[in-house]
Amino acid sequence: MPSLPPSKREILVFEPDVEGHSQEWLQHLVDFVAANHQAAAIAVLAPPALCATLSRSIPPVADGRIRFIAMKPSEVKLCGHRSLSLAAFARWWTMRRYLQRSGADMGFFLCLDLLSLPLAFGLGTHGKPLAGILFRPSVHYAAFGNYQPGLGEWLRDVRKDLLYRMMLRNPAVAAILSLDPFFPAHAADHYRHGGKVQALPDPAHPAADSAGAVVSADIVPPGRIAFLLFGYLTERKGPLMVLDALRLLPQRVAARVAVLFAGRVDPAIRDAIETRRDVLAREQPDLWLRIDDRRLDRAELDSLVTQSAVILAPYQRFVGSSGVLLWAARAGRPVLAQSFGLVGRLTREHRLGLVADSSDPAKLAAEIERMVDGGPQTFIDLSSAADFASSRTPHRFASAPATSPASPPPGRPATRR
């Protein structure tokens, strides 16, 4: 039976998380579907607060092709369980149940990584095809060069390799969209059904109207070089290593920099940040440091990125891509990023700034000093950065999920489970 054209289908888009990119990426999908009548209709299955926020932004031209389904509190709790295995099976079960209830033609996981476990067991959704976005493949990092995984990372990659291999054999899995542009080639070379893996561009944020932003034009003291770390500040994002590195700066360098942390601080590290902040105040009195512990809107972030000289991305051996690179590239600002993994490779290949072993405060401090002494703009290729950002648009990002294949490849029909 031939597949329905996209405009006659409905895709159930499932996202149980509210932190990170969830709202922003769902907004891209909503905007794309509203503006493109040939795209599939979407039903967004998400926590109530996220549904309420997104529903207020539906353009009038959507013409009933976008609807929202609020998850029950118990479902949100199970899908976010601390046991990742339990959360994975809860997400699969929730998708299976709502696909049947909603009448949607296929299911799409905004984040597929956890689902590799239940899908590797061959679990399906009543014969309806599934697709989703894979954020953190790492099994191909050896091809990046100088990859020396620890035992835990090696075991993680062995586990991922097995799960990916088995997941791709699942006839219910129609497509996997990878935010890592290098993983599809690896999948095609190493997995029997690797052709299901396709590259998906991480979307650069469109420029916001900053007229209403409440960011002062002189937030950074004049004469200082501003370093900005923004987003939801977890330990993995590197704020503690940055504070440790700032202690090691020569006094002459500390007197020339301004460091701003902008974004909600993870409660788990709030005390550690305050302790380091107190130490810095004693040991580096000439250093300017500000921590703005709150969620900032897009216009505020646009303004802060534009005002800053360097954007910090000192992740701690983080696997996957980072929207921070796109914010910086679009604004023409160099990054100081981790050397590890995809973030490091993209920074080097597209000449977006400098990389460092960000798990070592001394090496991070050395690169901060280098950027201050050499001038931040000498470490970015503005033309390459502009090309990097322009090739990763919200439209390109949203068009892939909204036009996902409606059925698995011919010859491998989805079984009913």
Predicted features by range, described:
Residues Q23-H28, T234-L248, D271, L326:
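A conserved mid-protein helix/loop that constitutes part of the nucleotide-sugar donor-binding site
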Residues W93-Q100, S138-H140, Q148-I176:
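Membrane-proximal helix-turn-helix segments that form the acceptor-binding/catalytic region
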Residues V310-I311, P334-Q338:
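Short hydrophobic beta-strand element within catalytic cores of glycosyltransferases
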Residues I219-K237, L243-L246, V259-F261:
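Conserved donor-binding/catalytic core segment of Leloir-type glycosyltransferases
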Residues R65, A272-A299, S303:
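Nucleotide-activated donor-binding/catalytic signature segment of Leloir-type glycosyltransferases, i.e.
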Residues M106-F109, G122-Y147:
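Active-site proximal beta-strand in glycosyltransferases
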